[in-house]
Amino acid sequence: MSGIASACLSCLSTVDRWCHITACLGPIGGRSRDGIYETTLADNEREAVSDLLGYLENRAETDFFRGEPLSALSTLVYSDNVDLQRSASLTFAEITERDVREVDRDTLEPILFLLQSSDIEVQRAASAALGNLAVNADNKVLIVALGGLAPLIRQMMSPNVEVQCNAVGCITNLATHEDNKAKIARSGALGPLIRLAKSKDMRVQRNATGALLNMTHSDDNRQQLVNAGAIPVLVQLLSSSDVDVQYYCTTALSNIAVDASNRKRLAQTESRLVQSLVHLMDSSTPKVQCQAALALRNLASDEKYQLEIVRAKGLPPLLRLLQSSYLPLILSAVACIRNISIHPLNESPIIDAGFLKPLVDLLGSTDNEEIQCHAISTLRNLAASSDRNKELVLQAGAVQKCKDLVLKVPLSVQSEMTAAIAVLALSDELKPHLLNLGVFDVLIPLTESESIEVQGNSAAALGNLSSKVGDYSIFVRDWADPNGGIHGYLKRFLASGDPTFQHIAIWTLLQLLESEDKRLISYIAKSDDVVHMVKSISDKNIESDEEDQEDGEGEVIALARRCLEFLGNGPRQTLVEA
């Protein structure tokens, strides 16, 4: 962010500053052309001027940040002579532009002193020097610690545009350091920054909006910014003709929209916000497009915005970004469409807008874990509410792509993929198609995953597929293989001791027993380990006053007893009256 200030800090470079400084110092240090001393100086000042002229002649070999050169500069700084102060401030501005390094308080204190001058030229050059030094991380902290904010805030309120610009640019640089952000927020700087964000001077506007952006990276600072009235200004500036201003404001609003309370305020007061962001997704500048999509993503954490983005015709530009070749654009777009897809009323509009095939393609066209997660999560959301949409997701190749990739992708992606298959497996019409695609080849091994989520999702998919499927020949075929087959999965989950896993396994077992497939039932009946564990579960006692357990474990016990009834082993009555 340090580059934000460059437009203003370079304002002095329109002249050869070294020549300008020397020209200023020359008449002070010696005689004018007519032989008359134009300025009366104290001896130490005259000596300092003479020394400084010598240092400037050998500036390439001179370190102005310590020793005699700094001492000579400091003498000029603390002089009552404004010409000397001007020369000192110009020298500091020049040397800090070509040599930025960590400095100590002996260097910073003279510059901070110059900031308090009433002379515009001194203010302008001193703030330029301070802004240059504020590129260094250690200097940022020390400038604030030495009280640099107060004079910078005063300079932001200067009527001189150049002074404003340099002061805001310096605060922008200071605000990039985490240690400074809360101090800046409490310093009284936010009000002037918000006012200067509306400046007619584009350099000032850029620096001010950049500073506001830097203040949006923590909850407390965002709240102070919102309370200071930043939101209407940031929203208004989305229509700026300047790309940098667009970017800073879009990113700032994206950060502000992270907080639910701020989204509520935006919804109440900024009716044009969504339309402006949708428009910016068609910007010719990728970084603006990216931040516009991310801002919409954050807004779409709320149901109201999920619907509003679709109504504002946000889907076509999102689809274009999704099909971009630029990874950050793809990521921002797919993250946004994922949130929008959460609303059931958006499922069909998103499908009808042509998102299915590009989303499926993203699963295999990138190894970016975040993009893959968002893409498959979106596909799962789109399939959630209707069998029609589930079928369209299947036809788009989502299940085949998941089957091809799921054993190779990271655990987070595996979790999303298995969850998506589980949702699709809820459709009775699609179950035979899923089985014929060979999903057991991946679901059964994944019930042994190191991830509890992947295990649970895979088992849930197997359970959904086991209900009312009609033809159970694949269950018979895969009873023992792969990876121990259905038998091995049931055994592991029943033995897990986890009530949720036991519930899934026993419910699945009951569906298989209800299948009326004699071979399958025979396999189950001969599986002594499974039958023994089901009996153990069915024999558990549940006290009638243990209401919390009755809801979960009690249901598992009831399912276990039903399984035993199918196997010809009726349960014993074990419920104890209180």
Swiss-Prot record:
GO terms for cellular component: fungal-type vacuole membrane; membrane raft; Myo2p-Vac17p-Vac8p transport complex; nuclear membrane; nucleus-vacuole junction; phagophore assembly site. GO terms for molecular function: identical protein binding; protein-membrane adaptor activity. Its main location: membrane. SMART domains: ARM. The keyword Membrane applies. ARM repeats lie at residues 58-95, 96-135, 137-176, 178-217, 219-258, 262-301, 303-342, 344-384, 428-467. The keyword Repeat applies. It holds the Pfam family Arm. SUPFAM superfamilies: ARM repeat. Keywords: Lipoprotein, Membrane, Repeat, Vacuole. PROSITE patterns: ARM_REPEAT (PS50176). One of its GO terms (biological process) is piecemeal microautophagy of the nucleus. InterPro entries: ARM-like, ARM-type_fold, Armadillo, Vac8. It is found in: Vacuole membrane. It is a lipid-anchor. Belongs to the beta-catenin family. Functions in both vacuole inheritance and protein targeting from the cytoplasm to vacuole. This is Vacuolar protein 8. The lineage of its organism: Eukaryota, Fungi, Dikarya, Ascomycota, Pezizomycotina.
